[in-house]
């Protein structure tokens, strides 16, 4: 149903979708300022805030959430049993993540690894790694997105964790260093990875495969370096109204309707997709798989974030970005976090 909703939106030429580039498009004048309309919503506080904040420039609001895709931690319960781990307990800290991944690695089974990382995909890497930094209460960018703040203890702890796995036999799946994101989720889906961060939009396929006799999957929020603290990357698509639209009122009617609890239930919850309305997440999934409720909880708890920078794509997502090079250096090479952080800032502040 996500694609039906997306297609319906795209048939309206006045509506535009964006992801991590919301601030860029807003600052370039692509969207209509709908601050008054958004602030006038009775349920604004019930909406997932990441996509609203990402599309806010100089106090003006341009976007609302449409498709919400969040990152969670998944693990293979079958491999956990073989490794002598509790199959019902995923990692509650980065140190536990490493410990559990190394236990699976020690099975020394053909093609099986503790974890997996998309080493050449800046987008997958921010989706996987930023939540652990946020969980610790640290930041990845300054407020206006012009400076990287990755030179902190939490980021270092996360990078050290993956470096430890990279230096462990079977710690990271073969191809992690070269993974462009094209087959990022496949190794876990194929039953070859113990535990890794994962997009919630891909978990449905895991659950369906499980019903057909596949391995059982565990799901938990992504932890930080401090036990019990979690966060998520609020990804997906935000939606705004084109600056050139001659039908702003009609477009707003559609957007305001889509934000309502009733519409969120019909369009998203009833079709097994993730709503962006907190009240819908709390009330419309009571009969859903408990793991779906766990996924929803990472949005409900309000700890998730969407990074905000006009130059986010160039600094993080683009092939060969300074962020991608930071990961390559920190996990598989010689790390200089201060210098690599500055290289990201140099792009952000152009």
Predicted regions span which residues?
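Extracytoplasmic "Venus flytrap"/periplasmic binding protein-like
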Residues: 1-47, 82-84, 89, 186-187, ...
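Extracytoplasmic/periplasmic substrate-recognition and gating elements
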Residues: 83, 164-170, 208-273, 325
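Glycine-centered hinge/linker elements that transmit conformational signals in sensory
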Residues: 99-103, 144-176
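C-terminal capping/gating helix-and-loop segments adjacent to ligand/active sites or protein-protein/ligand interfaces
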Residues: 279-280, 293-346
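Short, solvent-exposed loop/beta-turn-alpha elements that line the ligand-binding surface or hinge
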Residues: 32-47, 89-92, 108, 113-122, ...
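Short helix-initiation/N-cap motifs at beta->coil->alpha
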Residues: 1-5, 92-98, 175-190
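Hinge/lid segment of periplasmic solute-binding proteins
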Residues: 18-71, 125-128, 216-220, 287-289
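A structural signal for short loop-to-beta-strand junctions that line the ligand-binding cleft
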Residues: 5-6, 11-14, 41-79, 229-231, ...
């Amino acid at each position: 149903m996500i694609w039906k909703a997306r297609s319906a939106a795209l048939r309206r030429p006045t509506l535009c979708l964006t992801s991590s580039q919301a601030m860029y498009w807003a600052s370039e004048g692509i969207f209509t300022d709908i601050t008054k309309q958004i602030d006038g919503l009775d349920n604004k506080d019930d909406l997932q805030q990441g996509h609203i904040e990402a599309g806010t420039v100089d106090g003006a609001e341009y976007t609302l959430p449409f498709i919400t895709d969040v990152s969670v931690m998944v693990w293979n319960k079958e491999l956990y049993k073989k490794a002598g781990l509790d199959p019902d307990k995923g990692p509650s800290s980065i140190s536990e993540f490493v410990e559990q991944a190394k236990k699976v690695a020690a099975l020394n089974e053909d093609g099986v690894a503790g974890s997996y990382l998309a080493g050449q995909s800046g987008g997958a890497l921010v989706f996987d790694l930023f939540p652990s930094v946020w969980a610790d209460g640290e930041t990845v960018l300054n407020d206006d997105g012009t400076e990287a703040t990755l030179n902190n203890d939490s980021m270092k702890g996360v990078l050290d964790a993956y470096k430890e796995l990279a230096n462990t036999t079977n710690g990271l799946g073969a191809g992690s260093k070269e993974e462009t994101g094209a087959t990022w989720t496949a190794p876990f889906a194929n039953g070859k990875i113990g535990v890794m961060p994962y997009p919630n939009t891909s978990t449905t396929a895991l659950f369906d495969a499980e019903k057909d006799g596949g391995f059982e999957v565990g799901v938990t929020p992504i932890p930080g370096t401090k036990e019990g603290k979690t966060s998520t990357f609020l990804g997906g698509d935000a939606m705004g109204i084109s600056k050139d639209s001659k039908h702003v009122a009609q477009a707003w009617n559609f957007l305001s309707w889509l934000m309502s609890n009733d519409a969120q239930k019909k369009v998203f919850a009833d079709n097994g997709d993730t709503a962006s309305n907190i009240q819908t997440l709390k009330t419309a999934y009571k009969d859903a798989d408990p793991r779906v409720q766990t996924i929803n909880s990472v949005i409900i708890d309000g700890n998730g974030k969407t990074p905000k920078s006009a130059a986010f794509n160039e600094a993080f997502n683009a092939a060969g970005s300074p962020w991608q090079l930071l990961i390559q250096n920190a996990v598989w090479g010689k790390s200089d976090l201060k210098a690599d952080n500055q290289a990201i800032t140099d792009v952000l502040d152009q």
